[in-house]
Design a protein with these regions (language model features):
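Catalytic beta/alpha-barrel core
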Residues: 47-53, 80-89, 102-113, 131, ...
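Short, well-ordered coil/turn segments that N-cap beta-strands
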Residues: 1-4, 44-46, 77-81, 101-102, ...
């Protein structure tokens, strides 16, 4: 089953309804706890909680994130939090885990020191996800047309699953054409393939994979990249970026049928624009 992780991005002490690819605030700020509760009350059992200021090197909301996690644990003890944004060291990971996060995303910028990253992987095991923010090595790939934004919700998802004309074999991507390029600070880290090989050898438990071109663009997930990368690792893979409607989620579920380690998808902008109805999708 593909887990749906609604994202709550926090900047300047407030949750922003969506953000630009450069991390800029693109919507009115609301209480971070209220934003989380909105998705929990819609049925979410995981929250992807992001410190945008830490991710883009302009401050920290760590104390607020810790308070939000504590409040969620008190109000909804069955909900888990995935902490993301600006995590680059053992101290960062320990702080997030001590605050009650179940999983912590290590930022792609940490991959500049691959030896240190593999040491963190071995130390924190299943509690650590490694972010792979990637872009094409030469020219950016053209985003695929998004799935038809037909009525959102369970009916749309079921219809997409029944009627989508999926190819028998999903198209593949050439991982050699991608580089790891963090969305926060700094330029490209290096080619994806050798980095992935080193992380696999270290025993990485999960990757969060984001195609930078699609992040926040509502242009559909990069299915060839996700399928090929899932086939190149035994680790869990969480898709991030581009999801625009329930049809995109159905396409990811189809892909997960042949790549069972593709286990989750982070939902962002489409939730806040109303293009995805989380409550309807999670309804039994």
């Amino acid at each position: 089953v593909l887990r749906l992780l609604p994202a709550v991005d926090v900047a300047n002490g407030l949750a922003v309804t969506h953000r630009t690819s450069a991390g800029g605030d693109a919507g009115a700020g609301i209480s971070a706890l209220d934003a989380c509760l909105r998705w929990v009350e819609a049925g979410a059992d995981w929250i992807h909680l992001v410190d945008l200021d830490a991710a883009f090197g302009r401050g920290s909301n760590a104390a607020l994130l810790a308070q939000v996690i504590a409040d969620l644990a008190r109000l909804h003890p069955g909900v888990s939090v995935q902490w993301s944004g600006g995590v680059s060291s053992a101290d960062d990971v320990e702080r997030a885990l001590a605050a009650g996060a179940k999983r912590v995303n290590l930022g792609a910028g940490a991959l500049k020191d691959l030896a240190a990253t593999t040491a963190l992987v071995r130390r924190f095991g299943r509690h650590l996800n490694v972010c792979l923010d990637v872009s094409a090595a030469s020219a950016a790939p053209s985003p695929a047309a998004p799935a038809d934004p037909a009525p959102s919700g369970a009916a749309q998802l079921a219809g997409a699953q029944r009627g989508a004309a999926q190819p028998a074999t999903q198209p593949s991507a050439d991982l050699a054409t991608y580089v790891v390029h963090p969305r926060g600070q700094g330029g490209p880290v290096g080619p994806l393939e050798p980095i992935l090989a080193a992380l696999n050898e270290a025993g990485t438990g999960a990757y969060v994979v984001t195609d930078r071109v699609r992040d926040g663009a509502l242009s559909g997930p990069n299915l060839p990249l996700l399928g090929t990368l899932s086939g190149a690792t035994s680790a869990q893979v969480i898709a991030s970026g581009g999801v625009s409607c329930a049809g995109d989620i159905a396409a990811l579920q189809d892909l997960a049928a042949s790549h069972p380690n593709l286990c989750g998808v982070i939902l962002g902008k489409a939730l806040y624009t109303g293009q995805i109805d989380l409550k309807a999708l999670l309804r039994p």
